[in-house]
């Protein structure tokens, strides 16, 4: 009986983790991969759900194990998605004029595409650096900015599509 509960638990974790990844893939424009994962996901769901429901009155622990698997699956899906880092992002950096030029050079030396535009702060002129990059490079770019000893305001946004640009083609 314990192995049956383990099967329900781990199959549900796998199914929900796949659901999370499928959702992310589809929202990022990866329809084919999302559809393939969806097929696997629904196959697991049908098998697990039917096996839980077929004897739920006699063995209500199945329901608890199923719910625990669902909960852990959500967490695992988020962890896996974070590691895969599928997609693109935009990092906006606002800093002083002189620091902006220096930071742009530092980033460009690391093969990061940077567009620099003039910006107006409350007290002084600023530079805004606009960086479009793969999500996999997020931590590297943020560490580079923070490690440069330049006072900067950083914002990061996930984006769906970028056309053209430096260093972000698939």
Swiss-Prot record:
Member of which family?
A: Belongs to the UPF0316 family.
Q: Which organism is it from?
A: Clostridium botulinum (strain 657 / Type Ba4)
One short Pfam name that applies is: DUF5698
What PANTHER family does this protein's entry cite?
UPF0316 PROTEIN YEBE
Q: What is this protein called?
A: UPF0316 protein CLJ_B0679
Q: Which InterPro entries match?
A: DUF2179, DUF5698, UPF0316
Q: How does it sit in the membrane?
A: Multi-pass membrane protein
Q: Which UniProt keywords apply?
A: Cell membrane, Membrane, Transmembrane, Transmembrane helix
Name any GO cellular component annotation. Answer: plasma membrane
Q: What is its main location?
A: membrane
User: Where is the chain membrane-spanning?
Assistant: 1-21, 36-56
Q: What lineage, starting at the top, does this entry show? A: Bacteria, Bacillati, Bacillota, Clostridia, Eubacteriales
Q: Where in the cell is it found?
A: Cell membrane
Keyword Cell membrane listed: yes
